[in-house]
């Protein structure tokens, strides 16, 4: 059998499918673009959904790709098994309404078995199929597959809610009896038993039905366009070709493991327990790629996932004896392994290393904070007389502070406490269920719209025009084509149009359709791209219109001009962000409306006030310099040579539009813009905020709206000046600071008075010393506002030799708080409070020198105080 590197496998896959007329789709960003159903790109088909649901018609219906993907619903299994990964590569081939079952199976078999390609031994391949799908069974038989190698399984039907669905046929490679220690054999496949012998290497989904949850599967309707969706895991193929026992011994992971060996001084033993090595190697791959694609560690969403991965890897580093930040040192190795197809990791290496190292250092501080939380938690439990740490608290230590259960167990054991493991596992399961529920499987598609997909008439958007005459080519009303319509809403396609279809963050034009006499026959309320790319006008009709007639199309120029100002300002803002906070601040989303612009970008912290000031100043400088805005059409290679910034996630054809603003900004953009930056007038940032982990948002205004914003601020400042009796606006800051200083002085004075009062009260309490069995003690009820004040009393008591034991009781609201402190080796504070607390219907516990309890019966406070002497 061939011995192939991972790069050779990937290239051979793409070359084979190119030979079958497929176009290669580049690997997309791991952060989904315009798809809120996905946390991550989690399969090869996830980026092709627009083709499968018919909302966009691809240039070539045959597509192949090698797609980096992330799945995180089973993080805890990574490192425990031979094949679980967070980040992996999915190799795929796809047919959008072109070839179907026969070709997919035949070509798949050719790729797997031909000496020119993978050359797998045929007797090592097994296939599963859906029992009712005899067409697939017969196709495999026709290709020479033995019937004993074809296994029917009920699970071989791909379906997620409503939408495209169908049977699938999976291909397995038999690794032999060495991987079947109990000699179970083919039953491993037949009974779907988890095993290391029969490795699934490829799944071919035959998408031929529109699933409808309301009817039985046998009544599903056939899709108008049948599709092929396949996926093969590169890591699994590499393990087979390289004769590796697990995926981790392949050229995709082993170089990382070797680096970890150097850092830790430990040795990776293929036959031993190497979980920590595997976790680190897997997680740093996911971190490197995800951060390189713009996701950053944080407390929610994608950021939470990355933070969890980093902390898990860091904890496993500690298990290997690594005490300093080290994960960032592995980024270069990841980049070197993947450079041939994914150069972006090395290109962004410095930034990725900076983020990873910073997060490692932050985690070290968090571990310290977590230890404090754990100690306080156990103090509280002791005060309440409890000895078991609740499962949800264990989960919080694990989830928030990165404490592995073993670490929490060690801390608890030191305090004589146990763990609620069942509760922890329940909390963990809840989190996993939430994670799974938030992820829609990558292949999930919407229903196909056959009517819109069938529109093939050509239509051209004409730049620079606000009105023109056009022939009406298509009318769609009530989801059906018609020759004429007179009322309600309809979708229209013209042979040409001045209306911009919503795209690239720029909203659609609004306007009117007029007849030959100048009367308005329809109001355009939206324009979107049809599946084949034509501008599709949504209109409200006020008169009858017919296909073949000529109409005048007029856009609302005021709306267009406002949008253009904001769109050009967005380009200036993007460039300013690069210059001031770094080139990592790339666009993550934008909206250019008539009255404002919204720009989302990747950044790992809030933009400071000073940075915002510099950004605003720099953008306005470009506006006031009156720079011509030049748009040219060219090929993509020339555009890149010009230094044009391409937005990750946008798909560009061979011909592109390049928008240049002097030497300040060069971007690929299909939108409309002002002719000169001076037309923008002025630019003002209204707000900067975080909208998710690693993503910031700026909302800004231009022109008239910016003037109004400045005027509103001036009016507000005048109102403040009047309130604080400042004669001039420019004196407001000094006046406010003077008032603030007065407040601070009064607060200090108030605090000092409180401290004197507390000291006086403590002095009175500490004078009342009694004796019982040779032990000096103080037992008193005090008036305090919170339990913390009791500790302050105790701290003051410890500083001088007032007595051997202190017992304080306070009624706070409807609760009774009890504190016992002891300097005597004969009196254990924790034991004493366990006796006293029940008197006030409470319970508690603690250490020998300090203990606290809570109760509810304030009427028994004096009884408690009277009983102290009898218990010393």
From Swiss-Prot:
Its EC number is 6.1.1.7. Gene3D superfamilies: 2.40.30.130, 3.10.310.40, 3.30.54.20, 6.10.250.550, Bira Bifunctional Protein, Domain 2, Threonyl-trna Synthetase, Chain A, domain 2. It catalyses: tRNA(Ala) + L-alanine + ATP = L-alanyl-tRNA(Ala) + AMP + diphosphate. Pfam families: DHHA1, tRNA-synt_2c, tRNA_SAD. Binds 1 zinc ion per subunit. It is an enzyme of class 6 (ligase). One of its GO terms (biological process) is alanyl-tRNA aminoacylation. The keyword ATP-binding applies. Its cofactor is Zn(2+). Zn(2+) binds at residues 567, 571, 669, 673. Belongs to the class-II aminoacyl-tRNA synthetase family. Consists of three domains; the N-terminal catalytic domain, the editing domain and the C-terminal C-Ala domain. The editing domain removes incorrectly charged amino acids, while the C-Ala domain, along with tRNA(Ala), serves as a bridge to cooperatively bring together the editing and aminoacylation centers thus stimulating deacylation of misacylated tRNAs. This is Alanine--tRNA ligase. The gene is alaS.
